[in-house]
């Protein structure tokens, strides 16, 4: 019994020492609460479901038929400008969250029946990326996302339709960046 207590005590002391070292490491960084791991990953199987993939692309196609502004691209090279490959999933998480909250939820009564199936799927992806963070400064990413938001808002309802019409690009960009 004494040996078991000594073993448990040693384990607890080791855990305490490790915790103290971790706390010291954070203090040395100036107290920055940078995450240990980014959690910016999605399972490949999320993008291998033919039915929901088809519905996502059909929704995008239907909305793009209503999009009369062919001069503007929301999800393209400009969005990724200055963003490293390792930060792209975080960027796409930000775009996904904006698209859900500011575009899809308010427009949920349109483009049926696709919308009612695609929105919950994208919301699940957003939920799975909820712990996705990057270490350090994300100002360059926030700037790029803000430009996208400003473009959508400037275009009004036409911008929202354009964002829905680019759900296929959002889907592919999430897949490329997050798996």
UniProtKB/Swiss-Prot annotation:
<keyword id="KW-0202">Cytokine</keyword>
<feature type="disulfide bond">
    <location>
        <begin position="40"/>
        <end position="132"/>
    </location>
</feature>
<dbReference type="GO" id="GO:0005615">
    <property type="term" value="C:extracellular space"/>
</dbReference>
<dbReference type="GO" id="GO:0005125">
    <property type="term" value="F:cytokine activity"/>
</dbReference>
<feature type="glycosylation site" description="N-linked (GlcNAc...) asparagine">
    <location>
        <position position="68"/>
    </location>
</feature>
<dbReference type="InterPro" id="IPR009079">
    <property type="entry name" value="4_helix_cytokine-like_core"/>
</dbReference>
<feature type="glycosylation site" description="N-linked (GlcNAc...) asparagine">
    <location>
        <position position="97"/>
    </location>
</feature>
<dbReference type="GO" id="GO:0006954">
    <property type="term" value="P:inflammatory response"/>
</dbReference>
<feature type="glycosylation site" description="N-linked (GlcNAc...) asparagine">
    <location>
        <position position="54"/>
    </location>
</feature>
<comment type="function">
    <text>Cytokine that plays a critical role in modulating tissue responses during inflammation. Plays an essential role in the regeneration of epithelial cells to maintain barrier function after injury and for the prevention of further tissue damage. Unlike most of the cytokines, has no effect on immune cells. Signals through a heterodimeric receptor composed of two subunits, the specific receptor IL22RA1 which is present on non-immune cells in many organs and the shared subunit IL10RB.</text>
</comment>
<dbReference type="InterPro" id="IPR020423">
    <property type="entry name" value="IL-10_CS"/>
</dbReference>
<dbReference type="GO" id="GO:0006953">
    <property type="term" value="P:acute-phase response"/>
</dbReference>
<keyword id="KW-1015">Disulfide bond</keyword>
<feature type="signal peptide">
    <location>
        <begin position="1"/>
        <end position="33"/>
    </location>
</feature>
<dbReference type="GO" id="GO:0051384">
    <property type="term" value="P:response to glucocorticoid"/>
</dbReference>
<dbReference type="InterPro" id="IPR020453">
    <property type="entry name" value="IL-22"/>
</dbReference>
<feature type="disulfide bond">
    <location>
        <begin position="89"/>
        <end position="178"/>
    </location>
</feature>
<keyword id="KW-0964">Secreted</keyword>
<keyword id="KW-0732">Signal</keyword>
<keyword id="KW-0325">Glycoprotein</keyword>
<dbReference type="Pfam" id="PF14565">
    <property type="entry name" value="IL22"/>
</dbReference>
<dbReference type="GO" id="GO:0005576">
    <property type="term" value="C:extracellular region"/>
</dbReference>
<dbReference type="GO" id="GO:0045518">
    <property type="term" value="F:interleukin-22 receptor binding"/>
</dbReference>
<dbReference type="GO" id="GO:0050728">
    <property type="term" value="P:negative regulation of inflammatory response"/>
</dbReference>
<comment type="similarity">
    <text>Belongs to the IL-10 family.</text>
</comment>
<protein>
    <recommendedName>
        <fullName>Interleukin-22</fullName>
    </recommendedName>
</protein>
